[in-house]
Curated annotation (Swiss-Prot):
Residues the record lists as binding Mg(2+) 1: 61, 66
UniProt remark on domains: Calcium binds to the gamma-carboxyglutamic acid (Gla) residues in the Gla domain. Calcium can also bind, with stronger affinity, to another site beyond the Gla domain. Under physiological ion concentrations, Ca(2+) is displaced by Mg(2+) from some of the gammaglutamate residues in the N-terminal Gla domain. This leads to a subtle conformation change that may affect the interaction with its binding protein.
Signal peptide: 1-25
Role according to the record: Factor IX is a vitamin K-dependent plasma protein that participates in the intrinsic pathway of blood coagulation by converting factor X to its active form in the presence of Ca(2+) ions, phospholipids, and factor VIIIa.
Domain Gla stretches: 47-92
Protein known as: Coagulation factor IX
Amino acid sequence: MWCLNMIMAESPGLVTICLLGYLLSAECTVFLDRENATKILHRPKRYNSGKLEEFVRGNLERECKEEKCSFEEAREVFENTEKTTEFWKQYVDGDQCESNPCLNGGMCKDDINSYECWCQAGFEGTNCELDATCSIKNGRCKQFCKRDTDNKVVCSCTDGYRLAEDQKSCEPAVPFPCGRVSVSHISKKLTRAETIFSNTNYENSSEAEIIWDNVTQSNQSFDEFSRVVGGEDAERGQFPWQVLLHGEIAAFCGGSIVNEKWVVTAAHCIKPGVKITVVAGEHNTEKPEPTEQKRNVIRAIPYHSYNASINKYSHDIALLELDEPLELNSYVTPICIADRDYTNIFLKFGYGYVSGWGKVFNRGRSASILQYLKVPLVDRATCLRSTKFSIYSHMFCAGYHEGGKDSCQGDSGGPHVTEVEGTSFLTGIISWGEECAMKGKYGIYTKVSRYVNWIKEKTKLT
């Protein structure tokens, strides 16, 4: 203190120097050591909530919970655009996946005002609610369905058609595709049947080769069975695949156009040595029509197992080769023929349509205008009980128990068709029956599914 008083008295400037020296000698460390500095700069590990990925809870609460934040402010917290985007979708309008909307094991991805379901193989739809396998509703395919190696549905179409943009429907790829009615004046009310794909396993559905006999019958020789009673007049062009078979004197059977050069009919319609003329585009047999096309048959091929001397109606199917190709148009169009499995599937839809110029009542006159009739499929047990004659596995019954409606004499060889989404497929050949339209009796048809491979092999166009 004595020194300080003396200095202050003699030189005030020295006071300043003394104070500065005192301060410099004091412990006032400006920088922290490494350990303490690390504690201050330490950032807590991000917490994974399971819903918002990793985030710094404190910063997120401050930035986006206490106050409304922008996307960029949230981006500063996450320091990652992908994680920020996922958080942002929930932050803006809540978690759309909270209610677990995706079914059948589908994974939900949240979005703004929406969500997206990532479906397991075999399922599709907004919520993976649709079983897309072929065993359920035919995989939603309009014609044919198969599974690929990943168990996914692949739809396909019959010849003359291609898949539409939806990859489910089929659209014509040629001017006059098989099984389509293209005459413009025929109204939609004449669409003849509904497609009903049931929840059945359609894969590997071919039937066993079983003979269902009531009685061993060597030769069912009953010409009166050569099989539309109770039908309706068809409009011109409504059944453009239907043909009329003419002998040297009169018409005697029907048939269906397979392609420009071939017709399919019943084998029992073929008579050795009888010249056959096929008339396509026919409607009214009592007058010439501009839509008619006549072709001579140059070759008749019954199915190789057909033997009329043993049984006139077993394997009752034959092919007719024409001398000149038919000119396809709206009145002359082939019928579609699916593969074996699908032909059998279509038959099981339950209803088909038969057509022809046969007798309009039992032992009555033949029709001049093409007739058609909707007939229900009859289960095999009922069919067997209805007759004493043999019903083989390559036959089926269709018709009405109460009678009054049936195919009849002159209709033999004509088509039994099933309409599938506006396209008709051949499912049977009119073969035989006991009388016509009798109560408790049914029409018997050749089951085309048993012969499709043979038909396609023999009728290939070269």
